[in-house]
């Protein structure tokens, strides 16, 4: 299988730090995985180690534009597996899963909160803010080092807009909505088209249609020549014709003829 060739991202996009740091075993996996991902042009999103049905290590990654195709996941898995085998960050067998962040993805960087402004979000604070730990509402972008959220359920006496300090956020993720699904599908289709074109598996988009000459386009158009109106036939059965016919049958001469 041909390896995907991600677009070369800006260095700052790859190096942007995450707001969440995993503890324990997940932190050891992070130390090994993040440099490999960056070298391939991907960003680490989250690492989760679970013991359900054996030990599973899930590594979420993405391109700098927020997309992650199946081919990307396979390429990362092939590159990362031997590196993890050598580093041996855990002392037992585990199953490695490479995945995209998903549609209702976690928000782990400042740029995530800016990119998904206008979508519904739920946030759990590591440090309570204004006596609350959980917030749900419309993401309204970033202001300084805080996330703007138009909070749901605010009373008439409360300001629905809250500013949540980024470094006090424990977990933030998007809420699944029709609008979010539509945007995610659009991003995914565009990323797939870009990948196929870069690999030569799909033709480049056709050039724009040739524009017409403005001088010609603005010239007044002449309409078709009007056809001549057909000559109206002379009446054939008038009173005069009938009288003349009667006289002809009687052998009379019409004195009006020859005038």
UniProtKB/Swiss-Prot annotation:
Q: Please state where this protein is localized.
A: Cytoplasm
Can you tell me which family this protein belongs to? Belongs to the RimP family.
Q: Which gene encodes it?
A: rimP
Query: Origin organism of this chain?
Result: Rhodopseudomonas palustris (strain ATCC BAA-98 / CGA009)
Which stretches does UniProt call biased (Basic and acidic residues)?
243-253
Keyword Cytoplasm in annotation: yes
Q: Does the UniProt entry include the keyword Cytoplasm? A: yes
Pfam name, any one: DUF150_C
What keywords are assigned to this protein? Cytoplasm, Ribosome biogenesis
Gene3D superfamilies from the entry? Answer: RimP-like superfamily, N-terminal
What does the record give as the function of this protein? Required for maturation of 30S ribosomal subunits.
* Protein name, per record: Ribosome maturation factor RimP
Could you tell me which InterPro entries the record lists for this protein? Ribosome_maturation_RimP, RimP_C, RimP_C_sf, RimP_N, RimP_N_sf
Segments for region (Disordered) = 198-259
Tell me which domain of life the UniProt entry assigns to the organism this sequence originates from: Bacteria
Q: Which GO terms describe its cellular component?
A: cytosol
């Amino acid at each position: 299988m041909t390896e995907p060739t991600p677009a070369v991202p800006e260095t700052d996009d790859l190096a942007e730090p995450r707001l969440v740091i995993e503890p324990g075993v997940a932190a050891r996996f992070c130390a090994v995985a993040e440099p490999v991902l960056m070298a391939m042009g991907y960003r680490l999103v989250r690492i989760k180690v679970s013991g359900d049905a054996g030990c599973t290590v899930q590594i979420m990654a993405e391109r700098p534009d927020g997309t992650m195709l199946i081919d990307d996941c396979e390429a990362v898995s092939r590159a990362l597996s031997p590196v993890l085998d050598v580093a041996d960050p855990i002392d037992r067998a585990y199953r490695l899963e490479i995945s995209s962040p998903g549609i209702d993805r976690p928000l782990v960087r400042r740029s995530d909160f800016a990119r998904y402004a206008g979508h519904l979000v739920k946030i759990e604070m590591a440090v309570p803010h204004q006596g609350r730990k959980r917030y749900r509402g419309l993401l309204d972008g970033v202001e300084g080092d805080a996330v703007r959220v138009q909070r749901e359920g605010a009373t008439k006496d409360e300001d629905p807009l809250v500013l949540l300090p980024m470094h006090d956020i424990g977990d933030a993720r998007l809420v699944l909505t029709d609008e979010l699904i539509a945007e995610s599908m659009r991003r995914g289709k565009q990323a797939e088209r870009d990948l196929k074109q870069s690999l030569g598996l799909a033709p480049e988009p056709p050039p724009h249609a040739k524009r017409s000459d403005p001088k010609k386009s603005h010239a007044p158009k002449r309409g078709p020549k009007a056809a001549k109106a057909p000559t109206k036939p002379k009446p054939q059965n008038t009173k005069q014709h009938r009288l003349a016919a009667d006289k002809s049958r009687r052998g009379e001469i019409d004195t009006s003829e020859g005038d």
